[in-house]
Swiss-Prot record:
Residues 1-158 are annotated as: E2-like domain. Has an N-terminal E2-like domain, a linker and a C-terminal adenylation plus E1-like domain, dimerizes via the E1-like domain. Pfam families: ThiF (PF00899). Residues 159-373 are annotated as: Linker domain. SUPFAM superfamilies: Activating enzymes of the ubiquitin-like proteins (SSF69572). This is ATP-dependent ubiquitin transferase-like protein Cap2. Has the E1 and E2 ubiquitin conjugation active sites and the adenylation site; Cap2 may recognize the target as well. Keywords: Antiviral defense, Isopeptide bond, Transferase. Induction: Part of a CBASS operon consisting of cap4-cdnD-cap2-cap3. It is an enzyme of class 2 (transferase). It comes from Enterobacter hormaechei subsp. hoffmannii (strain UCI 50). Disruption phenotype: Essential for CBASS function; when the operon missing this gene is introduced in E.coli it no longer protects against phages T2, T4, T5 or T6. It comes from the Bacteria. The record marks R420 as: Adenylated.
Length: 600
């Protein structure tokens, strides 16, 4: 409940004047302050273009401001009685709830796209409060005109799914759909079946889809996930159905009730009541099939408006209303025919849908925040040496999309290693390679790392043949003996060899690369020795622990992280343009890095 306040801040009073001075806006109302400290002002906005069936000439809105930590939020909401009732693109779901607030939930998106990054200087929105209010109101006028003309989303724009009402805040169902998968699912339009899922170990409220079966329970598709994710048990707890298009009500409203979803099915020439009847009959007939709790709706989705569909996308909602073999109703016989009739009732009800959030965990979707070029993402990479530098480079490569990795190391992880290693205390006492691979396979769903818990070269012929399958061989041992072994090993084909080693106190980084059938150890060693790197000073060495004099390499975690970043970029460059390359990187006292290239 809001109350009119006699003493209104000067900036808000100025905003009222600003509205009445605009020929397309007007208000006779006063500012009101709600119990939850939200200022609101009711006003009318007028179109400058012809009206449409969803956008009238005049619509009533509420300008709402409130304090959110150190910022003042400014939003505009439709009035419950005289505002727009439809939901458009670039608008939150527009619903009139039973609260005492006078406005609905459907505030349009008026922000400039760059502001989502939290940097106002990237956008056009000003900083002063009154200027921000004026800017938002002018954006609203542009928005209602575009909505009336159906121009909120135009050809070439990125496709945006509608806002789903009452969607779970963090329960997430992950799936993986690539571009190549679309023809398979397009052939299943109008069909349905069962699906299994597994809980993501250690995560909160997160599932991922494992297998798809037809409606007879026969396996038709398996989703590939990381070895870590495949350890969990599968539960067949979902039903899938493929639609020819996104289920949406004009102009851009996600269905809120089962009846609205039935209407979307009917628009596609399908019947949701028939689907429920068929699902119920199959579940009751399959004695080992537990009652599914989720309904997955798949449909082809394009990346940009006007493009051809690129891949299948899945929506999820809680499945309810199906009868089981024990379902009875007073006055009715508990027959299969009656239960099929009862199953058809839920899709025609006004009961709200409980939408569940879904995400596409396909490789190209996971790394939209940043990934390596395809040149290296397509390569199989072997890292020899899972110490501080090797572990951090392996993690960097995994996160940017180099998912097929082999890690080789014979050593066990010591507690002392943890001060500058990617691993944690839970890995102490384990083989470094095996523990690092376990860590890598937990990073992202498409990870595919394997370990070789041995020294190089391995004695086993099976292991030797496995190593020969890798395209890029990265040495992170800092051991001259390993370089000689790299040269002596019969790789059978041309490889991209890379050797990275930190200098004393991690003041510099040696970086050598070659694309040949064997590692050119003489050239690499001579390059390393010729570089102006700091001399080893045993007086600066640290002891491993009290009671023994076993010197350890002095370097801080931030130094190792720096060289891991530089080394990762070097690896990416070399793979994109193979050849003999040697570079020496030196860290300056202020933390900057200088590169000393060496010509061939």
């Amino acid at each position: 409940m809001s109350t009119v306040v006699q003493q209104v801040p000067a900036e808000l009073q100025a905003a009222l004047t600003l509205i009445n001075n605009d020929p397309r806006m007007r208000t006779n109302n006063a500012w009101a302050l709600s119990a939850d400290k939200r200022w609101s002002l009711k006003f009318t906005a007028e179109l400058s273009v012809p009206c449409s069936s969803f956008m009238p000439d005049n619509s009533v809105w509420h300008l709402v401001l409130w304090q959110e930590e150190t910022l003042i939020r400014i939003e505009v909401y439709p009035d419950k009685s005289e505002g727009i009732s439809a939901t458009f693109q670039h608008q939150n779901y527009n619903f009139s709830d039973a609260s005492t607030r006078e406005w609905t939930s459907g505030n349009p998106c008026l922000e400039n796209t760059p502001t989502v990054f939290g940097r106002n200087l990237w956008g056009l929105e000003p900083e002063a409060l009154l200027d921000r209010i004026s800017w938002r109101l002018s954006r609203l006028l542009l928005w209602i005109d575009a909505a009336a003309q159906e121009k909120l989303a135009t050809t070439g724009d990125a496709v945006e799914l509608p806002a789903f009402p009452d969607q779970s805040p963090f329960t997430v169902i992950g799936f993986s759909e690539q571009i190549d998968d679309l023809p398979f699912w397009a052939s299943k339009t109008g069909e349905w079946g069962f699906a299994s899922s597994t809980g993501l170990p250690g995560a909160h409220g997160t599932l991922f889809l494992r297998e798809f079966l037809d409606n007879k329970g026969k396996l038709i598709r398996t989703t590939k996930w990381s070895p870590f994710m495949r350890k969990g048990a599968r539960t067949t707890n979902a039903v899938w159905s493929v639609l020819p298009t996104l289920p949406v009500l004009a102009p851009w409203q996600a269905p809120r009730t089962w009846q609205e979803l039935s209407h979307c099915f009917a628009q596609c020439g399908l019947s949701l009541p028939d689907l429920f009847s068929d699902i119920g009959r199959s579940v009751r007939a399959l004695r080992k099939q537990r009652a599914p709790g989720l309904l997955l709706l798949g449909f082809p989705l394009e990346n940009k408006i006007g493009d051809e569909p690129a891949r299948i996308h899945w929506l999820a909602l809680r499945l309810a209303g199906l009868s089981n073999t024990m379902t009875k109703r007073p006055g009715f016989r508990p027959t299969e025919r009656n239960r099929r009739t009862w199953d058809r009732e839920q899709p025609l009800s006004q009961e709200p849908i409980r939408w569940v959030r879904t995400q596409n965990w396909a490789a190209d979707q996971l790394r939209t925040r940043g990934e390596a070029a395809n040149d290296i993402r397509s390569k199989k990479v072997l890292i020899i040496g899972a110490g501080s530098l090797g572990s951090m480079i392996a993690e960097n490569l995994m996160r940017i999309g180099v998912v097929s990795q082999g890690i080789l190391d014979a050593d066990l992880l010591q507690t002392g290693n943890l001060s500058r290693h990617a691993l944690t205390m839970t890995s102490v006492g384990h083989n470094k390679a095996a523990a690092l691979v376990e860590h890598l396979n937990r990073i992202l769903p498409d990870a595919s790392a394997r370990s070789f818990s041995c020294a190089f070269p391995p004695e086993s012929e099976v292991a030797k043949n496995s190593l020969r399958q890798y395209d890029v061989i990265i040495d992170c041992t800092g051991d001259d003996g390993v370089l000689k072994s790299l040269a002596a090993f019969d790789w059978k084909s041309e490889k991209i060899f890379i050797s990275l080693a930190m200098t004393w106190r991690a003041e510099g980084l040696f970086a050598f690369a070659a694309s040949e059938t064997s590692f050119p150890v003489t050239d690499a060693s001579s390059r390393f020795n010729a570089s102006a790197s700091p001399e080893i000073d045993m007086d600066e060495a640290r002891i491993e622990g009290i009671g023994c004099w076993h010197p350890v390499f002095p370097a801080r975690a931030d130094d190792v992280q720096l060289w891991a970043a530089v080394g990762t970029k070097f690896i990416c460059r070399v793979v994109s343009a193979p050849g003999r390359i040697y570079e020496y990187f030196k860290q300056m006292p202020d933390g900057t890095v200088e590169k000393e290239p060496h010509e061939y």
